[in-house]
Amino acid sequence: MPWIQLRINTNSDDAETISDLLMEEGSVSITFEDGKDTPIFEPKLGETPLWRDTVVVALFDAETDLTPTIAMLKTLPFLGENFSHKVEQIEDKDWVREWMDNFHPIQFGTRLWICPSWREIPDPTAVNVILDPGLAFGTGTHPTTALCLEWLDSLDLSDEEVIDFGCGSGILAVAALKLGAKNVTGIDIDYQAIDASRANAERNDVADKLALYLPEDQPADLKADVLVANILAGPLRELAPLIAERVKTGGKLALSGLLKEQAQEISDFYSQWFDMDAAAHKEDWSRLTGKRK
């Protein structure tokens, strides 16, 4: 069935209020969009950030008469009589199929492929990670994930113990295991990430080699030959002593989730524990690597 879409230009202070009112008016879904192409790279812990100029997009059943809703919105002091909005009719589509069509197998490095579960594997002889992008988090398309996957592909992980700090979907953990790691420990603050990592490990027949923990449950004596942390600059700095403690002497480290302008500061900070290499870059993002002193 077709839908009616109402787009309202507002700001971050009023977006949530408008969203609540539109839900009361019968909207079946609400999304927020960036009104002026303003990136938000690193929200604070627990924060759900919005852009200063935010577009509230509400979807209604096609039979809905929006005249009373728009009249109500005009009475709001922060919108006013002439508030900026647009009403559109949206034809129905097979949204799931359209979403699935956007995901294709991607190669990282020389050996590794990330393949959506519904796609044919391009090279059966390669190291193939079968991933369901609907489960959560990393799919390999983001530059930071790609940088980490390329780094893992470049290593000889045979019989190595690996830690994936901030494991998300488990894409890095599963890739490490498929590339020959002896075992991997995945750590994440999100229960959904733990579930997603477990599901993707099972899908790739490596679940028996993957241990998953919330931060408070990780073993106190945990150490690894290789540690990869694709999180953000703030947590990387805050967790640096713990991350350093988790890497064996001579072990390898990769850090990502960093903007180019953040890389040097984080590299300098980690240099008290690691011999750091030059940063690698992809688009606006960076990856740092080093060897434990």
From Swiss-Prot:
Main subcellular location: cytoplasm
Organism classification: Bacteria, Pseudomonadati, Pseudomonadota, Gammaproteobacteria, Alteromonadales
Keyword set includes Translocase: no
The keyword Magnesium belongs to this UniProt entry's keyword annotation: no
Purpose of the protein: Methylates ribosomal protein L11.
Protein's gene: prmA
GO CC term (a single one): cytosol
Binding locations of S-adenosyl-L-methionine: 145, 166, 188, 230
Organism, as annotated: Shewanella baltica (strain OS223)
GO molecular function: protein-lysine N-methyltransferase activity
Subcellular location: Cytoplasm
E.C. number: 2.1.1.-
Enzyme class: transferase
Protein name listed in UniProt: Ribosomal protein L11 methyltransferase
Signal peptide: none
UniProt-listed GO biological process terms: methylation
Reactions performed catalytically: L-lysyl-[protein] + 3 S-adenosyl-L-methionine = N(6),N(6),N(6)-trimethyl-L-lysyl-[protein] + 3 S-adenosyl-L-homocysteine + 3 H(+)
HAMAP family in the record: Methyltr_PrmA (MF_00735)
SUPFAM superfamilies, A to Z: S-adenosyl-L-methionine-dependent methyltransferases
Keywords annotated in UniProt: Cytoplasm, Methyltransferase, S-adenosyl-L-methionine, Transferase
Family note: Belongs to the methyltransferase superfamily. PrmA family.
